[in-house]
Amino acid sequence: MSTPTSLELPEGTRPTTVETARGSFAALDAMPDAGPCELGSALLIPGYTGSKEDFIAILGQLAAAGRRVVAIDLRGQYQTEGADDPGGYDLAELGADVTAVAEATEASHLLGHSFGGLVARAAVLDGYSPASLTLLSSGPAALPGARAEELHRLLNYLDGTPTADLKGKVAEMWYGSMKRQAVKAGADAPVVAFLEERMLANNPTGLITMANQLLKAEDRTDQLAARSVPTFVLYGEDDNAWPTTEQRDMAARLNAERTCIPGAAHNPNVEAPATTAHALTKFWNAAEA
């Protein structure tokens, strides 16, 4: 799970709610701390089990360039209300949510991290046309390898549980292993408390359905390339989700800009925020030129 190193919001950043025709979405809204907001705004989409807080380390730096930056919780994540119907978490439905939020916030640039990249791609394939699309640590198709095995274990653990009991099973999962893993990874007490609150707030139906989406996603790179949206593929040199070779090849098929972030793994926004923010600002500025 993506783990922020700090929960302190940058200057100019506030928690808010984005109202759309498809519902309300919890958000962090960052504006330049000083100077005008003259550049195109950006919308950031988190990954599986993630949230808007995953972007705290880069929000201030991105906004400082002179643009509004909004990060959201997807439907069923943390502080955004979920759907009880599994169909509400199909990539197409989540993509439609993103389009609605992008329109409400007048976003020019769209970024999706990990699973959020698949969601952002779905929005573009359904007709949304941002000034640019960034796929951050996201791949062309289903999640492979060890991360896929983790999802299979999660699904096996929750399989057959009555809907009314799912929240309890998620809590067992958190207290049984995930909390210990977070502490072992070096998260301090306030961050561990946040991770606990976030995990237990996730809609269990969403957790299950999004996991299945990650395991079954089709390669739609060629369809995305046909949309001709300026695209940026950005990932850490030690990404342990989609192999870096897959992301490199996806970038080539998309004729996309590509940057590999030194010293980062699956969460460059947390592990190398300054380098990541610089790369994004450079790409977004070029897309607006």
Where are these regions (language model features)?
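Active-site loop/turn elements of alpha/beta-hydrolase fold enzymes
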Residues: 74-77, 138, 263
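Active-site loop/oxyanion-hole signature of alpha/beta-hydrolase fold enzymes
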Residues: 8-10, 21, 64, 70-111, ...
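Conserved catalytic-core motifs of eukaryotic protein kinase domains, centered on the activation segment
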Residues: 54-56, 80-86, 145-147, 244-245
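Conserved loop-alpha-helix segment in the C-terminal half of the alpha/beta-hydrolase fold
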Residues: 228-264, 270, 275
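Conserved alpha/beta-hydrolase catalytic His-Asp/Glu region
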Residues: 143-149, 164-226
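Alpha/beta-hydrolase fold catalytic core
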Residues: 1-43, 64-67, 135, 172, ...
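Flexible "cap/lid" loop of the alpha/beta hydrolase fold
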Residues: 121, 125-164
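Conserved HGGG/HGGXW glycine-rich cap/lid loop of the alpha/beta-hydrolase fold
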Residues: 26-82
